[in-house]
Amino acid sequence: MKIVLTTVQAPFVKGGAEFLAQNLNNALIKQGHESEIVSIPFMDSPLDLIEDHIVAARLFDLTNSWAGKIDLCIGLKFPAYYIPHPNKVVWALHQHRGAYDLFDTEYSNLKNDVVGNDIRKIVINADNKYLHEAKRIYTIADNVTKRMEKYNNIKSTPLYHPCPDMEKFYEGDNEDYILMPSRINITKRQLLAIEAMLYSKTKTKLYVMGKSDTEYERDRMLDFIKEKKLKDKIKYFDSVSQEEKFQLYAHAKAILFIPLDEDYGYITLEAMAASKAIITAKDSGGPLEFVIDGKNGLIVDSTPQEIAKAFDEFATSEMMCKKMGKDSKEHLIDMEITWDKVVKELTR
């Protein structure tokens, strides 16, 4: 089949969504399909652009190309999953969360005012109207499925996929640090983790790894570390190679991943692939679909004090690190998350 994957792109920004699209594209080609990624630009600031992008998505026609008829369209991201096609399935990474669970919070530029409520209504109405055009609706995680049902009363099916380079992660000898990988972003809550180090009673270090979405967020984090006099407790890795990333995972005592209501979270799967236990929070969303409290990680309240307690538990017990790390890898194997399964379901 000739298949197009519709998604959005913010120039010079690359994260989990871009990796997913590329890996799905590769998996489809490996299965003998002709597949292309079709990206449209997207910005949600100024707010008027949101409605403009919705309208633009509806004006595209992907029924045919110069290479002939397009057999299947797989919609991945808002508002690209609105692009019309007679044979479309949606595999939603997430909806425009600023209009839903993040509305009128510090994590969204949509506020409870006239403009914010108008744009929110436009987004919700568009989802209610256009998502139903798809023959089947999938999401990348049960957390996304539950949100879609809660806010739109739209049924969908969770479909898990492997993280990039999952087979390349490995287990090494533990060194005296706990790793917090993620791009530097307010929803990933690095500042909360840094604050937790004020309450840690061990000498174990926190390694923070990830590029920042903006210079402002990076500088704010570094200033916070300096202000709290935590330079001896925290080490920051801005840009690392893939090999360096694998090494940092391999030698960590555990992985700290405490995002706010994450959709899916590659970090969790990466930790499991590297035979590492995960510290996550009760409001972290996606990771809770993989972490079993007390078996392959710890699920704690999202307070600096509780995070510090979990941090210190792993810091002081090598046996706990090894046992939970082993259980983590076994749990991942048991879940049988493969691209072959994803392709089979999306193209059936």
Question: Over which residues does each language-model region extend?
Answer:
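Nucleotide-activated donor-binding/catalytic signature segment of Leloir-type glycosyltransferases, i.e.
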Residues: 218-240
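Conserved donor-binding/catalytic core segment of Leloir-type glycosyltransferases
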Residues: 170-188, 194-201, 206-208
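Conserved acidic donor-binding segment of nucleotide-sugar-dependent glycosyltransferases
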Residues: 293-294, 298-305, 313-318
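Short hydrophobic beta-strand element within catalytic cores of glycosyltransferases
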Residues: 277-281
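Glycosyltransferase donor-sugar binding loop
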Residues: 205-222
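Membrane-proximal helix-turn-helix segments that form the acceptor-binding/catalytic region
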Residues: 108, 113-137, 145
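Aromatic "clamp/platform" in nucleotide-sugar-dependent glycosyltransferases that forms part
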Residues: 260
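A short, well-ordered alpha-helix in the C-terminal region of glycosyltransferases
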Residues: 306, 313, 320-335, 341
